[in-house]
């Protein structure tokens, strides 16, 4: 699912204490010649609140089944996100479909300044201080995927230093 991103560390769910957050449930309709067939679509974010997070989509005729399918899908898509002292290592933008998300690191004590779907993802990752802005589409599916796009582009200072072949001091001081 995350093949387009470099340096993505996939994580197995075994041994992790994962908490799931329901982002949204939508009732969907399929119109057939015999009438309307109703179903449900659920999007869920799971994480250990310590840098590991995953998102999943589940569909079923029943709400509970859709949610449980979404949780199982999310556990299959776990990735590790680099964090720095309870916030993000640097500013990052992400996009998916019509949704655009901007994430900014914040000083300690700021809290999570985010709404709806972005908040659920950031809480599941374990970020405590961050500023965010959602632009464009507010569709929860697209916003979650745009947030993941931004998070998967994050790189720690150690990773940047290793890729550039310089010391950590050189990364920070230029």
Curated annotation (Swiss-Prot):
Residues 18-81 form the S5 DRBM domain. InterPro entries: Ribosomal_Su5_D2-typ_SF (IPR020568), Ribosomal_uS5 (IPR000851), Ribosomal_uS5_bac-type (IPR005712), Ribosomal_uS5_C (IPR005324), Ribosomal_uS5_N (IPR013810), Ribosomal_uS5_N_CS (IPR018192), Ribsml_uS5_D2-typ_fold_subgr (IPR014721). One of its GO terms (molecular function) is rRNA binding. Pfam families: Ribosomal_S5, Ribosomal_S5_C. Keywords: Ribonucleoprotein, Ribosomal protein, RNA-binding, rRNA-binding. SUPFAM superfamilies: dsRNA-binding domain-like, Ribosomal protein S5 domain 2-like. It comes from the Bacteria. GO terms for cellular component: small ribosomal subunit. The keyword Oxidoreductase does not apply. The keyword rRNA-binding applies. GO terms for biological process: translation. NCBIfam families: rpsE_bact. The N-terminal domain interacts with the head of the 30S subunit; the C-terminal domain interacts with the body and contacts protein S4. The interaction surface between S4 and S5 is involved in control of translational fidelity. Belongs to the universal ribosomal protein uS5 family. Part of the 30S ribosomal subunit. Contacts proteins S4 and S8. With S4 and S12 plays an important role in translational accuracy. This is Small ribosomal subunit protein uS5. The lineage of its organism: Bacteria, Pseudomonadati, Bacteroidota, Flavobacteriia, Flavobacteriales.
């Amino acid at each position: 699912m995350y093949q387009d991103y470099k340096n993505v560390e996939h994580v197995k769910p075994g041994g992790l204490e994962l908490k799931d957050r329901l982002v949204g449930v939508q009732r969907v309709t399929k119109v057939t010649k015999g009438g309307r067939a109703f179903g449900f679509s659920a999007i869920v974010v799971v994480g250990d609140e310590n840098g590991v997070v995953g998102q999943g989509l589940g569909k079923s005729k029943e709400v509970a089944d859709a949610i449980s399918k979404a949780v199982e899908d999310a556990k299959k898509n776990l990735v590790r996100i680099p964090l720095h002292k309870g916030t993000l290592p640097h500013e990052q933008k992400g996009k998916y479909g019509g949704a655009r998300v901007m994430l900014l690191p914040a000083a300690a004590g700021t809290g999570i300044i985010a709404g709806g779907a972005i908040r659920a993802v950031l809480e599941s990752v374990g970020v405590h201080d961050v500023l965010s802005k959602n632009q464009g589409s507010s569709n929860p599916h697209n916003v979650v995927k745009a947030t993941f796009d931004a998070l998967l582009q994050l790189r720690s200072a150690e990773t940047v230093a290793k890729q550039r072949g310089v010391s950590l001091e050189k990364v920070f001081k230029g």
